[in-house]
Amino acid sequence: MQDFLALTLQGEQPATREGKQANFSWRWLGEGLLECTPHAQYDKAVVLSAGVHGNETAPIELLSHLCTDLFAGRLKLAVRLLLVLGNPYAMRQGKRYVHDDVNRMFCGGYKNLPVTEESKRAEVLEQTVATFFQESSSQAKRYHYDLHTAIRASLLPTFALFPYQTHGYDADLTASLEAADLDALVYHNALGKTFTHFTSENFKAASATLELGKALPFGQNDLSQFASIDEVIRNVVSEQALPVRNKPKIRVFQVSDSLIKKDEEFHMNLSAEAPNFSTFTKGEIIATQPSGNYVVEQDQVWILFPNPNVKIGLRAGLVLTETI
C-alpha cells in the first residue's frame, strides 16, 4: 500500500486495491477511503475522518502517519477501521470547501443542493460508512472521531462537539476525549447535518467532532501540538490503555440556542477576530437585526462559531451555557 495521503492528493489509485498485512487485511474503497480489518476477533468498529474541510491539514497528516505506521507494523490494529479523507476535491485546492460546506450536507442534506463534486462526495461518504458499519461484526461497538481544525482563535483551544442524540452518550468516548487533554466538551441541542450527526443518528455510533487548533497549509503544521490526540486515537485503534489527563478538569457546555440570520442587516457585537468562547452576560445584546435583537437572558453565555456573513436563514453562531 503506497502513501495514503499522497495517492489522495494526486487523485491516483494504489497499484493493488486490496491486500494482507501481518495482522490485518485492507481494501482501498475509493479516493481517500481505506478499510482495515484485523485477522483476530474485534469488538469495535471505528471511523477516523479528517479533511471534511479541505484546508484543515493537521488532522489529515495525523491520519496519514497513523496509516503509514499500521502498514509498517509499528502500530498494531485491534479494531475494524475506516480511514476517511473527506473532501479531496477541496484538499487539492487548499480550500475549506469549493462550492458548499460538506459538513452541512449529511443526513441527506446534499439532496437539497446543486450536484457538485462535493455534494456527490457527501453521498459517497454516507454510503461508504453505512456499508462499513453494516459489514462489521454485529457485536462491535461503533465509534466515529471526525477531526478538524478551526478557522478562528479560541479561548479554549481544543474541544469536542457531541451530536444531539436521544440515546445515552458513550462513557468510553468521553473518557478518550478527556485523556486527549481537550479543554471542553460541547453538547448539541438539536439535530444537524454534520458527519457525526449522520453516524450517531443512523448507526448509533458514539460520535464526536474534534476541533484541534488552527488551520494551516500542508507541511506547515507543528504536529507536536497534536501529540495528545494522536496518542489517544492510536491507543483507540490498538486498544491500549488511555493516557492520564495532564490538564485541569475538562469544561462542559450545552448549546442553549442558535443565532439565526433572518435579515440582510444582521450585526453581531463581536469583532471579526473575536475568539470562540467569547462571553456575554445577562442583558447584553449579542446580535441585532430588524426582525429582533438577541438579548442574553442567562447570567453568562459563551459564543461558538460566530459568523455574521452566512446566508439568510443560516446559523450565525451557537449560544452556550456551562454545565457546572
From Swiss-Prot:
The first-level EC class reads hydrolase
Give the InterPro entries listed for this entry. Answer: AspA/AstE_fam (IPR050178), AstE_AspA_cat (IPR055438), Aste_AspA_hybrid_dom (IPR007036), SuccinylGlu_desuccinylase (IPR016681)
Q: Which reaction does it catalyse?
A: N-succinyl-L-glutamate + H2O = L-glutamate + succinate
The pathway to which it is assigned is: Amino-acid degradation; L-arginine degradation via AST pathway; L-glutamate and succinate from L-arginine: step 5/5
Q: Example GO molecular function term?
A: hydrolase activity, acting on ester bonds
The portions of this protein that span the membrane are none
Binding sites annotated in the UniProt record for Zn(2+): H53, E56, H148
Q: What does this protein do?
A: Transforms N(2)-succinylglutamate into succinate and glutamate.
Into which family does the record put it? Belongs to the AspA/AstE family. Succinylglutamate desuccinylase subfamily.
The protein in question is named: Succinylglutamate desuccinylase
Source species: Acinetobacter baumannii (strain AYE)
Q: What lineage does the source organism belong to?
A: Bacteria, Pseudomonadati, Pseudomonadota, Gammaproteobacteria, Moraxellales
Question: Which gene is this protein's source?
Answer: astE
